[in-house]
Amino acid sequence: MEINIIRGQNQIGGSIIEVSSKNTKIILDVGSNLDDKEIVVPEIEGLFKGEAKYDGVLISHYHSDHEGLATKILPEIPIYMGEKSYEIHKITREYIKKEYLKEPRVFKSEEQVSIGDIKITPYLCDHSAFDSHMFLLECEGKKILYTGDFRSNGRKFFQSLLDKLPKVDALITEGTNLSNDKIGKINLTEKELEKRGIELLKGNDRPVFVLMAGTNIDRIVTFYKIANTTKRLFLLDTYAGQITATIGGNIPNPRTFFNVRI
């Protein structure tokens, strides 16, 4: 297999990475640039214009710097995305009245899919975007791991993911926050943030307002736990309410949780 970093090597986000074998070409993520005020579609032949030359595009998660150009891909090229990640992508795009993907091929964690002669296994990973995945690519006796975006301070146990991953021949990753400790920036875990929030709000009956991304599900869970422990009603805006109601399950949402409202 060959790896070609089309974009993203010298910047944060905006990732477009090509992996090819003798018979197959795939793309890992199609992010828009964070600094672009308007979507700028790069002139990539066979992906965004001309005759399609790629066999598939894999989207690791719904943040725009990794999927912002997904709707600009040539329609003949299949797009693969996590099921819940796609649902959040669709809700977000509808909410801001932007075009969304109509029929991507959804995958589930650790269920292998094949694109041509490349086998891909998605692995659920911890990130501020719900349903984020790493991709293990196998072909021609080689293994490549593409991490997408990940962290180790959320609510998922990072070591259990590491234990599942095999040894690989190549690792593709971003390193945008590797040096935080050196510059004195402290990254609290979600559980540490929960503990600090409870300490601050206990014995305080005034309203509390939190500014955060409505798609950061781990953070919503953290502040729900803070509200629940300090006996407060948990209020979400309409966007976050729609996101959490769609995800459902154990995620605090206005549809099934009695103390969550919009």
Language model region names:
Residues 238-262:
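A contiguous, basic/glycine-rich beta-loop/short-helix subdomain that forms a polymer-engagement track
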Residues 1-58, 64-218, 222-225, 229, ...:
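His/Asp/Glu-rich metal-coordinating catalytic cores
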